[in-house]
Amino acid sequence: MTRFLFAIILGFLLTACQQVTVEETEYVPHKLTELRVGTLYGPQIYMTSGQGNSGFDYDMAVLFAEYLDVPLKMVPYTNRAELYDALKKNEIDIIAAGMTETPARREQFRLGPPLYRVNQVLVYREGMPTPKDITDLKGKITVIADSSFVETLTQLQKRHPTLVWDQVTDKDSEELLAMIANKEIDYTIADSSSVQINRRYLPDLRSGLVLEEKLDVVWLLPPTHSDGLMSQLLAFWHQEKLAGTLDHLNEKYFGHVKRFDYIDTRAFLRAIETVLPRYRQLFETHAGDLDWRKLAATSYQESHWNPNARSPTGVRGMMMLTQPTAKEIGITNRLDAEESIRGGAAYLRDMINRLPESIPESQRMWFALASYNIGYAHVEDARKLAESMELNPNAWRDLKKVLPLLQKRKYYQKTRYGYARGSEAVHYVDSIRRYYDTLVWVDNQSKQQNSDEEEPSDLASEDGPAPVPGTLSPDKPK
């Protein structure tokens, strides 16, 4: 009997000591059927126009979607708080909006690898006193709410308790920069890349104090359940880094805007208003399959749209053609604006067609312009030199490094065609790219204005507020 009771008690105790397994519901990440990318509008982030979509973040998002083998869905927002909220609620998969790495963002989200670097700078307008430090301001600072600029000012306020600023939720960085130029606000803070891009259209912008240096621009991922997507993003980033994609996009969006000439930019904007209307139709007619604005930008670089222009070397006219070139393409009067534009377009098209097929379509124009400037043979010399230096002869970012070497005996004595002023060719192409970007911006602003004027006024009251002037996307932002 005692043994029987002992066995029962022992069995009960063993049963009580067994581990109880509680079945928990695990989070199963959804398989991506499309890549939903939350973003903000901006020339270096995401823009849409009649020529298609563009932007550093957009181009990378396209490649990432291709890497994942899913369709891309860009979801633009106009408010950072709503953008952050959408990521936390799983309404989007990732934020790609030119955002820098900050302590606050590290706490809230997972951060992707660095895409490029920027400085945070204080921005004011031409004619205002140059501030010596953040306490030496003759007016108010206005910044975007929920931005990294608020974090920077908050840290500065700890050392300078009298520092105050205004925050706005209904403006983006471009609008604040325009308000600086239009004397509507005194100061703002912006990323250096934004200032460099926007001063092509707003030449009165000045950047003063550097408040933060070398900040990494990153993508933001959800704080939880994003291990798989993060692993894929890191693998994709490593692949594109090795392929030179990041360097290519950096050069594409920022390589030509670092140089800035205040007087030249103002003169160009005036010429767009006063001179271009006389010749625009000719550029559009004779551009053919070229973008007429690239042809017009080339002509401005050559002659400032002066049909009687002449250089000491004998080139003349709107497109500054040499006598042999004019004869070759059937131009009899280089001083006739239409003949010169027609001839310049034909010559430029010929340069493009002569280039090797290995040069990507997106970069062929820059190679052709360099050929237009110093000759096709010297560009071929530079390509061969690039190859010998283990650089990519089909990438403009690498050719920019090599072309100036054609002025050094150490290098040009090894080439077939010898010495060439390669650094001038680089400057020439960069200038045309800046003029072209400005023409695109002005053209799009004009189209948007015309569209707003043609739209019936009662539609605005039925459908909500009218779009912000300058918004170029047909997508309705959230």
Curated annotation (Swiss-Prot):
Record gene name: mltF
UniProt-annotated stretches for the region LT domain: 258-478
Region listing for Disordered, in residue ranges: 446-478
Active site residues per record: E302
Functional summary from the UniProt entry: Murein-degrading enzyme that degrades murein glycan strands and insoluble, high-molecular weight murein sacculi, with the concomitant formation of a 1,6-anhydromuramoyl product. Lytic transglycosylases (LTs) play an integral role in the metabolism of the peptidoglycan (PG) sacculus. Their lytic action creates space within the PG sacculus to allow for its expansion as well as for the insertion of various structures such as secretion systems and flagella.
Region of interest (Non-LT domain), ranges: 23-257
Keyword Transport attached: no
Signal peptide: 1-22
Compositional bias ranges of the Acidic residues kind: 451-461
InterPro entries, alphabetized: Lysozyme-like_dom_sf, MltF, Solute-binding_3/MltF_N, Transglycosylase_SLT_dom_1
GO biological process, one term: cell wall organization
Family: In the N-terminal section; belongs to the bacterial solute-binding protein 3 family.
Record remark on domains: The N-terminal domain does not have lytic activity and probably modulates enzymatic activity. The C-terminal domain is the catalytic active domain.
CDD domains tied to this protein: MLTF-like (cd13403), PBP2_YfhD_N (cd01009)
Sorted UniProt keywords: Cell outer membrane, Cell wall biogenesis/degradation, Lyase, Membrane, Signal
Organism: Shewanella sp. (strain ANA-3)
Protein name: Membrane-bound lytic murein transglycosylase F
Lipid bilayer topology: Peripheral membrane protein
UniProt cross-references to SUPFAM superfamilies, sorted A to Z: Lysozyme-like (SSF53955), Periplasmic binding protein-like II (SSF53850)
